Amino acid sequence: MEKGFSVGWRIRTTAEFRRIYAARQRIIGRYYLLYYRENEIKHSRLGVVASKRNVRKAVWRNRVRRVVKEAFRIRKKDLPAFDIVVVAKASSVEADNKELYECINKLFTQLEKQSKRSSSV
């Protein structure tokens, strides 16, 4: 299993983020919003947004991002070929790492179900 979060697995440019937001497909969780869009490559990619407006302190923003990246790293082989943007909500500050991890895993599971539903139609 890959340990890192290399460039090929990341969403990096503003244009890519905008394209995903424009698709208007999202799943809402307690601590995160997950936006997604099918991509042309064979694997999923991730972008994480933890804005100063929602998550004030840098330490908190980094923690919120770290949990998402770790959950993605563990499940990336199982996820469908989507570009995924995870946006941290203000409520994420109040949660501990376990709650954040459970929330993002739940969102990833819902994404897998969505993709199976849309591919069977």
Swiss-Prot record:
Its EC number is 3.1.26.5. One of its GO terms (cellular component) is ribonuclease P complex. InterPro entries: Ribosomal_Su5_D2-typ_SF, Ribsml_uS5_D2-typ_fold_subgr, RNase_P, RNase_P_CS. Pfam families: Ribonuclease_P. Keywords: Endonuclease, Hydrolase, Nuclease, RNA-binding, tRNA processing. It catalyses: Endonucleolytic cleavage of RNA, removing 5'-extranucleotides from tRNA precursor. It is an enzyme of class 3 (hydrolase). It comes from the Bacteria. The keyword Nucleus does not apply. The keyword tRNA processing applies. GO terms for biological process: tRNA 3'-end processing; tRNA 5'-leader removal. GO terms for molecular function: 3'-tRNA processing endoribonuclease activity; ribonuclease P activity; tRNA binding. HAMAP family: RNase_P. NCBIfam families: rnpA. RNaseP catalyzes the removal of the 5'-leader sequence from pre-tRNA to produce the mature 5'-terminus. It can also cleave other RNA substrates such as 4.5S RNA. The protein component plays an auxiliary but essential role in vivo by binding to the 5'-leader sequence and broadening the substrate specificity of the ribozyme. PANTHER family: RIBONUCLEASE P PROTEIN COMPONENT. Belongs to the RnpA family. Consists of a catalytic RNA component (M1 or rnpB) and a protein subunit. This is Ribonuclease P protein component.
